[in-house]
A protein has these predicted regions:
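Non-catalytic structural scaffold of enzyme domains
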Residues: 1-226
Length: 226
């Protein structure tokens, strides 16, 4: 099979090596590249949502990915997930959103969902995605948002342990509240999972479900390429 090529659009310089290692294990010979603009999040936060300038920049990045020969483009940030719906129409390459499989999993588990994030701009798009998936299945979703800005501030100040502590305390409180699922709305929260094995409520993070679906798509593309 021909090796597939994926381009991942990022809004932060997250641990790329974990993503590359996961995809290379699942997809033989895959070429993984990244386009990262770390100013996107601050621009979205400053304006309360994606501006036309943010949309235009991400559309240019998607077109650059297409020109580079990518077989698949991945939107890896929930905050700009709705922007992906726009730029997907401007390229002739399939676009996948990292959090869509997680949203589908949340809907499959029930209708009462807790959403936790450290950025307010992440919660709205994540909730709307879950509600959209639920509506497609005839379900009215009840999403409750939990914003932990102090965790974000701790991370930006160089205190990841404090970031993790704040989030884990909050998640353990949510575990007592009878939700059908707790959605960790930022892919970076995957790092918390090993320390949250005591949580009984299904705890969802987009890394494994999202990149698992992306790996399946890349293998499908490779088979088609021959």
């Amino acid at each position: 099979m021909a090796a597939p090529h994926v381009c991942i659009l990022q809004t932060s310089f997250a641990k790329r090596e974990d993503t590359v290692a996961f995809l290379k294990e699942k997809v033989p010979g895959v070429r993984v590249e990244f386009i990262t603009d770390s100013t996107l999040l601050s621009d979205v936060r400053a304006n309360g949502g994606p501006t036309q300038a943010v949309i235009d920049r991400m559309t240019l990045y998607a077109k650059a990915a297409e020109i580079s020969g990518a077989d698949l483009i991945v939107n890896s940030c929930s905050t700009v997930g709705e922007v992906a719906d726009i730029y997907a129409k401007e390229v002739n390459v399939p676009v996948m959103k990292i959090d869509l499989p997680m949203a589908k999993e949340a809907v499959s588990l029930g209708t009462k969902i807790a959403l936790i994030a450290t950025l307010e701009t992440t919660l709205g798009p994540s909730q709307r995605l879950i509600e959209k998936v639920g509506a497609e299945q005839g379900k009215k979703m009840e999403c409750t948002q939990y914003l932990q800005n102090p965790a974000w501030d701790a991370l930006q100040a160089g205190h990841p342990e404090e970031h993790n502590r704040i989030l884990m305390e909050s998640i353990r409180e949510l575990d007592k509240m009878g939700y059908d699922a707790i959605v960790m709305a930022q892919v970076s929260m995957r790092a918390l999972l090993p320390d949250l094995k005591d949580v009984k409520t299904p705890l969802l993070c987009s890394f494994y479900s999202g990149y698992g679906a992306i790996a399946d798509k890349l293998n499908e593309i490779a088979a088609q390429k021959g």
